[in-house]
């Protein structure tokens, strides 16, 4: 399941992030690459653990914690601290699959990457190219979203970023370990939760059908989740 989530960050929050990022020091993006990715990756990245990366990462994590759609879709158990990249001057990232396990350097923290996320921090009209292209059994999906919007997709997906030929594409990217490992079960729970909310708006939270379906949702979550 691929999902676009609007307004994870407000325009004011995006501007605040960009103000800090635009004066920060950037390094070669291969600092966080695995072997396969290092052969495919051409971009710049904020150093992992830098004060700017930590400050903006905390802001993003707070925003995710307040976003009901993100929680319903991802059912997050762990979120890898957000990283930040920049593409310009023809830079791109060829087809690859993200590493299954991500380690936070210098700590014992690790995340199984069930879901990948890209949070756009540049308006689409400010650069050419730079589309995130995600492949699944239905074909290719080309993603280029407004600043503050996020795309969430299975970390098992082949994906690439097309060359940026004008301007610069700045974004945050990170991985989520879900309480529900199985993608199909997770998608079913998200669909069920969404439908329950729709019925509740029409019938009210105290409607017996809403109460019953909510019980079904939680019992399925109890059966499938690791917490």
Swiss-Prot record:
One of its GO terms (molecular function) is L-ascorbic acid binding. Keywords: Dioxygenase, Iron, Metal-binding, Oxidoreductase, Vitamin C. The keyword DNA repair does not apply. Fe cation binds at residues 96, 98, 159. The keyword Cytoplasm does not apply. 2-oxoglutarate binds at residue 169. Pfam families: 2OG-FeII_Oxy_3, PKHD_C. Its cofactor is Fe(2+); L-ascorbate. It comes from the Bacteria. PROSITE patterns: FE2OG_OXY. Coiled coil: none annotated. Binds 1 Fe(2+) ion per subunit. It comes from Cupriavidus pinatubonensis (strain JMP 134 / LMG 1197) (Cupriavidus necator (strain JMP 134)). Its EC number is 1.14.11.-. InterPro entries: Oxoglu/Fe-dep_dioxygenase_dom (IPR005123), PKHD_C (IPR041097), PKHD_hydroxylase (IPR023550), Pro_4_hyd_alph (IPR006620), Pro_4_hyd_alph_FE2OG_OXY (IPR044862). This is PKHD-type hydroxylase Reut_B4660. Residues 78-178 form the Fe2OG dioxygenase domain.
């Amino acid at each position: 399941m691929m999902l676009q989530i609007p307004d994870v960050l407000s325009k004011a929050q995006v501007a605040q992030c960009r103000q800090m990022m635009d004066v920060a020091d950037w390094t070669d993006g291969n600092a966080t690459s695995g072997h396969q990715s290092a052969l495919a990756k051409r971009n710049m990245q904020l150093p992992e653990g830098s004060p700017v990366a930590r400050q903006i990462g905390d802001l993003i994590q707070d925003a995710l914690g307040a976003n009901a759609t993100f929680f319903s879709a991802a059912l997050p158990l762990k979120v890898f601290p957000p990283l930040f990249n920049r593409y310009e001057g023809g830079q791109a990232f060829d087809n690859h699959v993200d590493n299954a396990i991500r380690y936070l350097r210098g700590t014992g923290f690790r995340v199984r990457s069930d879901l990948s996320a890209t949070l756009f921090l540049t308006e689409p009209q400010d650069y050419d190219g730079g589309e995130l292209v995600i492949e699944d059994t239905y074909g290719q999906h080309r993603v280029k979203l407004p600043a503050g919007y996020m795309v969430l997709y299975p970390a098992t997906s082949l994906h690439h970023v097309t060359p940026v030929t004008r301007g610069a594409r700045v974004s945050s990217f990170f991985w989520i370990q879900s309480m529900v490992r199985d993608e199909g079960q997770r998608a079913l729970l998200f669909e069920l939760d969404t439908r329950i909310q729709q019925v509740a708006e029409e019938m009210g939270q105290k409607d017996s059908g809403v109460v019953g379906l909510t019980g079904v949702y939680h019992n399925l979550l109890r059966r499938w989740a690791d917490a």
